[in-house]
Design a protein with these regions (language model features):
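Polyanion-engaging groove/track-forming segments
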Residues: 1-240
């Protein structure tokens, strides 16, 4: 039914309705964004994956950004030639040449230095400033910086093994950091509440079969199974 959901919504746009038999993930955009965030922290930090996550309204709005800011950020990423990798050290951990070029750290350094000095005529502290940063771009740059730093921090914390109770506590913490309650709409807060409920279920379920420290890959496998469950099996279309 999920593949037909957009067509149903278009046909019944003037009628109050809801579509049942949709998975938790497809019916909760905040949950979907959170799962992408978790998976991204253990990946290569490819620029497209990072920007795709930031472009979700549920995410960018939590960092004080709007659609115009996100378009500008995409432009900055292209101009500073960010491609993949957190840093030179991250590339080394992936058993690749330890080069800072085209990493997120290199791009952020150029953007921040450009905002600070406003010229690209020479290097400062081995960084070539990106000069096309205007004063009114401060909010966009600040939001991007905070978002990337949260990803960087999470990538280190979530790379470790924890028991199920520690995982529940850690994941609840990062749900709050990614989606601060004070900047969320009532609808988003309701979606976030569902995330919290699922994470508490995770602790109980895994405790029943496994009490040793486990990695994020195991947690993601459990979450993927949980969020593909349908919300309702009572029909395809119901009135509200």
């Amino acid at each position: 039914i999920e593949q037909y959901a957009p067509f149903i919504s278009a046909v019944f746009a003037d009628i109050q309705h809801g579509i049942a038999d949709k998975s938790l993930r497809s019916s909760n955009a905040t949950l979907d964004a959170y799962l992408k965030f978790l998976r991204l922290t253990q990946g290569r930090f490819g620029w497209q994956s990072v920007i795709d996550l930031l472009e979700q309204k549920e995410v960018y709005s939590c960092f004080g950004l709007n659609e115009t800011d996100v378009i500008l950020i995409r432009h900055w990423v292209a101009e500073t030639r960010i491609r993949w990798g957190k840093s030179a050290q991250h590339k080394k951990q992936l058993q690749l040449p330890e080069s800072v070029e085209n990493t997120w750290q290199a791009g952020l350094d150029r953007l921040l230095m450009g905002y600070a000095v406003g010229t690209d005529d020479e290097f400062f502290a081995d960084v070539l400033p990106y000069a096309e940063i205007e004063g009114n771009s401060a909010d966009a740059l600040g939001g991007l910086y905070d978002f990337i730093q949260l990803l960087f921090k999470a990538s280190k914390v979530l790379a470790k093994a924890y028991d199920s109770n520690e995982w529940a506590e850690t994941l609840l913490k990062y749900a709050e950091l990614l989606f601060p309650a004070e900047v969320m709409s009532a609808e988003q807060q309701a979606e976030k509440l569902q995330i919290n409920e699922i994470l508490l279920e995770l602790s109980t379920d895994i405790n029943e079969v496994h009490d040793q420290p486990i990695l994020l890959s195991v947690i993601l496998a459990w979450l993927d199974g949980r969020v593909t469950e349908t919300k309702s099996a009572n029909g395809f279309l119901r009135g509200q």
